[in-house]
């Protein structure tokens, strides 16, 4: 039996939070003794406390993927003899979580072609590092911090929420997309890296109000405004400004766009996957990309920037027709008060015309995308299932 682990992670519906929950579940199911310490954000830092789940978090309500959350918390609530510490969070928090005379393991991710300069010393505090993609492994290796880097992908969801035909029809009416023959959708926060303005401009350029298409944008309540200060503003206002500018530039009424700038439960997010015909993202880069991963797991075609960690599950251009052409560009400093992104880094940028062309091509002939999506979903079902990835995770944490 492996020795025990003290496991630090967020209990929240973020990429870090959901990926860590799946990893924690895999460790428990593999018989590894684990005590879970839940991280809570506190300004620029975090606090940590042993899990004590007195009620289901709001984001987990009715979510089939989190039905076992109470049981998972109960299985990891008590102290265990441990010789390893796993911190599933950004490296800035590792120093306060790692323990002397223990094997300290950091699980993290990055999205550009170079790591933040201040990460070098933080990464050196770990005994090993776990990242979710080959793209990340290359970036971390280039940093030459002298710490072993292991690639363990995020796990395929073990359950999704079902949505019957009547529920799908009702949701389409509520979202105003009941007349659309093709529904594009995206699930991304409103921040510079996700580049939602390019997607909105491309959609307005690609289609008219008469076209039977729609775009559903699930985003955050607040977003970041224009550089260099990136003021926090309501995402609805930011999106409307982009759409208004695009409409003026095109000189015609826009196609149907529905903005959802609020938090949603896992069940609500899965409902978008169920009614959407194609997931689309003009992101500048992803370490893995859980939104696209879930869409691909369900067999939805993905149209997305062709650079980043998502290539591990979407594949190369020959097998994935949804790869959007890109060029590598300099990254603006962000966030302005304490940047981790710097101009010495590069990420991928897609052009409005190229995205618009890809959207029109999908509507004209979606079958190549659907066939590829079926193959990708089959690969994910086989290669990213818990028994497969769980074994890789245990090996990364325990093979000395």
Regions found by a protein language model. Give the residues of each.
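N-terminal pre-catalytic "stem/leader" segment of glycosyltransferase-like enzymes
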Residues: 1-82
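Conserved donor-binding/catalytic core segment of Leloir-type glycosyltransferases
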Residues: 5, 177-194, 200-203, 215-217
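Extended catalytic core of nucleotide-activated donor transferases of GT-like folds
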Residues: 47-143
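A short helix/loop element that forms part of the nucleotide-sugar donor recognition site in Leloir-type
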Residues: 161-177
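Nucleotide-activated donor-binding/catalytic signature segment of Leloir-type glycosyltransferases, i.e.
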Residues: 223-267
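Aromatic "clamp/platform" in nucleotide-sugar-dependent glycosyltransferases that forms part
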Residues: 284
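Short hydrophobic beta-strand element within catalytic cores of glycosyltransferases
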Residues: 301-304, 314, 319-325
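A charged, aromatic-enriched C-terminal amphipathic alpha-helix characteristic of glycosyltransferases
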Residues: 346-355, 363-395
């Amino acid at each position: 039996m492996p020795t025990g682990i003290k496991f630090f992670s967020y209990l929240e519906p973020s990429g870090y939070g959901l990926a860590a929950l799946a990893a924690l579940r895999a460790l428990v199911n593999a018989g590894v003794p684990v005590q879970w310490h839940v991280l809570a954000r506190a300004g620029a830092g975090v606090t940590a406390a042993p899990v004590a789940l007195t009620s289901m978090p709001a984001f987990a309500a009715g979510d089939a993927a989190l039905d076992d959350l109470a049981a998972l918390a109960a299985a990891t609530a008590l102290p265990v003899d441990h010789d390893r510490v796993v911190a599933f969070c950004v490296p800035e928090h590792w120093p306060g979580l790692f323990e002397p005379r223990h094997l300290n393991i950091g699980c993290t991710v990055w999205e550009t072609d170079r790591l933040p300069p201040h990460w070098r010393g933080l990464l050196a505090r770990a005994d090993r590092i776990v990242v979710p993609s080959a793209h990340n492994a290359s970036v971390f290796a280039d940093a030459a911090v002298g710490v072993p880097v292991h690639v363990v992908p995020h796990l395929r969801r073990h359950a999704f929420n079902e949505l019957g035909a009547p529920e799908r029809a009702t949701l389409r009416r509520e979202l105003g997309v009941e007349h659309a023959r093709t529904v594009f959708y995206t699930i991304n926060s409103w921040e510079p890296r996700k580049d939602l303005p390019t997607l909105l401009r491309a959609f307005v350029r690609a289609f008219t109000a008469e076209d039977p298409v729609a775009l559903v944008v699930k985003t955050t309540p607040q977003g970041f405004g224009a550089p260099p200060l990136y003021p926090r503003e309501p995402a609805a206002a930011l999106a409307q400004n982009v759409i208004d500018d695009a409409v003026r530039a095109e000189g015609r009424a826009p196609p149907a766009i529905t903005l959802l700038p609020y938090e949603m439960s896992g069940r609500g997010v899965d409902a978008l996957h169920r009614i959407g015909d194609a997931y689309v993202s003009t992101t500048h880069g992803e370490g893995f990309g859980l939104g696209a991963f879930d869409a691909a797991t369900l067999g939805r075609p993905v149209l997305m920037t062709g650079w980043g960690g998502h290539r591990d599950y979407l594949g190369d251009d020959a097998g994935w027709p949804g790869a959007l052409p890109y060029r590598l560009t300099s990254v603006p400093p962000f966030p302005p008060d304490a940047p981790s992104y710097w101009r010495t880094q590069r990420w991928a940028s897609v052009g409005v015309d190229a995205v618009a062309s890809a959207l029109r091509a999908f509507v004209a002939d979606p079958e190549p995308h659907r066939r590829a999506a079926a193959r990708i979903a089959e690969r994910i079902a086989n290669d990213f299932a818990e028994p497969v990835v769980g074994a890789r995770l245990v090996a990364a944490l325990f093979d000395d």
